[in-house]
Amino acid sequence: MTKSVTVKDLKERLNLELICSETGLERPILTSDLSRPGLELTGFFSYYPEDRVQLFGMTEISFSEGMEPEERLKRYKQMCTKRTPAFVISRNLEVPKELVAAAKEADIPVLRSRLKTTRLSVYITNYLESRLAPVISMHGVLVDIYGLGVLITGSSGVGKSETALELVKRGHRLVADDNVEIRQEDELTLIGSSPAIIEHLLEIRGLGIINVMTLFGAGAVRSSKKITIVVHLENWDPDKHYDRVGLDQEKTKIFDMDIPKITVPVRPGRNLSVIIEVAAMNFRLKNMGYNAAEQFTQDLNNLIGHNSSMND
């Protein structure tokens, strides 16, 4: 699932000036890629990415000023197709009247920005990539723990929300409860957030729905967070083998990404919030180059080797 974005959304997000064709602001933008139509101004249309936002900078405007008005109008009309979402002019450059005429005829918005072309292209691309990223919904709770986005999963009633509440009381921040919307912004980044209708809310069985921001303040919540690790809670199974050393690293797949996963068995007497908090701290430590399990194994092997040599 992807969220739709219109030219109007882009205009409002980047505070762009509308030059013409207000009725065309509802045109959809289907790709985050931009087009700098330099070759098209020379008449080369063998490959014209018509479905992209067409960005004009100093180069395109300066080149078009050297063309005859009739030829300039012809080129702009060729650029105006049913799939073209908008034309954007950078640097507050003067918009060619032929472009305005062609865009009005095709009902395509022409927008203008004060920003330099390179910076404007970065802002547009980043915004569109974020809005057009594929999105899925997952059942779970997302909490920011020591700067790491920890997605807590598990079956209904296992204690995810109660654990999140305890983590918030310990100074961490809630991102989403029950329904986590996850979007893949690029090949290495998953961003989790909450649906607007349940943002900052936490459902506790026997207590009901509470507003975390109202109870604990603005510092106890955040709107989105990059997902770094998944902690899966499951009821303790006495017949199942659970990792006791920490050498093996589980993975779980979200979209096409493998995310580190820790399975935590749940049974009375276990303080889940502390376990998850320490799991996040230990994960950070591993990323910094220290692995307690590997160090223990190495020390144990050294001790065994030393004792063996002594016996020999």
Swiss-Prot record:
GO molecular function, one term: ATP binding
Summary of the function given for this chain in its UniProt record: Catalyzes the ATP- as well as the pyrophosphate-dependent phosphorylation of a specific serine residue in HPr, a phosphocarrier protein of the phosphoenolpyruvate-dependent sugar phosphotransferase system (PTS). HprK/P also catalyzes the pyrophosphate-producing, inorganic phosphate-dependent dephosphorylation (phosphorolysis) of seryl-phosphorylated HPr (P-Ser-HPr).
This protein's domain notes: The Walker A ATP-binding motif also binds Pi and PPi.
Binding site for Mg(2+): 161, 203
Protein biosynthesis keyword on record: no
Name of the gene: hprK
Protein name: HPr kinase/phosphorylase
SUPFAM superfamilies: HprK N-terminal domain-like, PEP carboxykinase-like
Signal sequence, renumbered to the chain: none
Region annotation Important for the catalytic mechanism of both phosphorylation and dephosphorylation: where it falls in the sequence: 202-211
GO biological process, one term: regulation of carbohydrate metabolic process
Quaternary context: Homohexamer.
Record has Ligase as a keyword: no
Segments for region (Important for the catalytic mechanism of dephosphorylation): 265-270
Keywords on record: ATP-binding, Carbohydrate metabolism, Kinase, Magnesium, Metal-binding, Multifunctional enzyme, Nucleotide-binding, Serine/threonine-protein kinase, Transferase
Annotated family: Belongs to the HPrK/P family.
Note: Both phosphorylation and phosphorolysis are carried out by the same active site and suggest a common mechanism for both reactions.
